[in-house]
Amino acid sequence: MKQAGFPLGILLLFWVSYVTDFSLVLLIKGGALSGTDTYQSLVNKTFGFPGYLLLSVLQFLYPFIAMISYNIIAGDTLSKVFQRIPGVDPENVFIGRHFIIGLSTVTFTLPLSLYRNIAKLGKVSLISTGLTTLILGIVMARAISLGPHIPKTEDAWVFAKPNAIQAVGVMSFAFICHHNSFLVYSSLEEPTVAKWSRLIHMSIVISVFICIFFATCGYLTFTGFTQGDLFENYCRNDDLVTFGRFCYGVTVILTYPMECFVTREVIANVFFGGNLSSVFHIVVTVMVITVATLVSLLIDCLGIVLELNGVLCATPLIFIIPSACYLKLSEEPRTHSDKIMSCVMLPIGAVVMVFGFVMAITNTQDCTHGQEMFYCFPDNFSLTNTSESHVQQTTQLSTLNISIFQ
């Protein structure tokens, strides 16, 4: 919303969600037409080995970079949660982001990622969905109680802003699940295109409204102060938001294994013929997670990670490759709706990818990692804590980092 402009941002959210819905169904249709059951094999059969290699790189990089971003979010978010524990020194190394990233990796994400069957993560996904609902409620509550006290930036309500293409990249990052779509499709009891279509339609509708609520409430609260991780904008001494941070940190930790499954599958398909022995399954999983963890320890600015992953990886996986595969495989007439939409998506995806990358490099976001905003200081504003303790709290203006959305 900060990059695109609030009205245009809402319209782009609906548009990206529609394109995502269409391309997810198109992808499975392409698999049915080609008789393939993985994204890589579909592209291999359609465009040969060069296409297979390109897709493999993209399909590995997107979830791998997502794993890095989830580690960054977990470290930043949970460190602030533990700092709120009475008697805990904020400078204690054991509540620092580096220690938390390492601990969460060893304790949760690595064991969950060692599963072989993605269907076993179903209960984990259900927990994540429940926590997301709680987080949304907290963001909405703070939009009502905190938003009116924060000054709005001068250009807060303009229809469109120059960085709208970058916003499309971030939105693509949020909606994409193409890299694991065949994994989910094959886990259905009766995998058919019709059943997949119904599942996707329902999932996308729910997702887009959750995203709109998050984006709207977050932007209405902080307007132009918004950053890449929404919780960076809230004050550290807000107990309700602290609970939200905890839920958010748990959610991204539980989402992490889904991405690891995809990176491991790509490696298995490219280097091991699609099958990993028990030993190599463990070795590959540990290696991927170790590298992702080390990189996340060196990076603490989320915004640029989301943008680059969105425009370089998510955009071709959503817009370009499914459309290109379907156009080459389908024997439907040129006037068929699927072919018309594919012809529209393909060039738009190319434009978003090229210009989004250029703009992400030339117009980098400010990243005020770990800094409190001016409205959180006692001299600027005080807000009565609405939690059960009714303790008087003060609030400061932190630059809004919206990892849910911009």
Curated annotation (Swiss-Prot):
Residues modified by glycosylation: 44, 275
GO biological process, one term: sodium ion transport
Record protein name field: Putative sodium-coupled neutral amino acid transporter 11
Cytoplasmic topological domain residue ranges: 1-7
Pfam family, one: Aa_trans
Gene Ontology cellular component list: membrane
Molecular function GO terms recorded: L-amino acid transmembrane transporter activity
UniProt keyword annotation of Glycosyltransferase present: no
Domain of life (superkingdom): Eukaryota
Annotated localization: Membrane
Family: Belongs to the amino acid/polyamine transporter 2 family.
Annotated function: Putative sodium-dependent amino acid/proton antiporter.
Keywords on record: Amino-acid transport, Glycoprotein, Ion transport, Membrane, Sodium, Sodium transport, Transmembrane, Transmembrane helix, Transport
Residue ranges of the TM segments: 8-28, 48-68, 93-113, 121-141, 156-176, 202-222, 241-263, 279-299, 301-321, 340-360
This protein's encoding gene: SLC38A11
Organism: Homo sapiens (Human)
Topology relative to the membrane: Multi-pass membrane protein
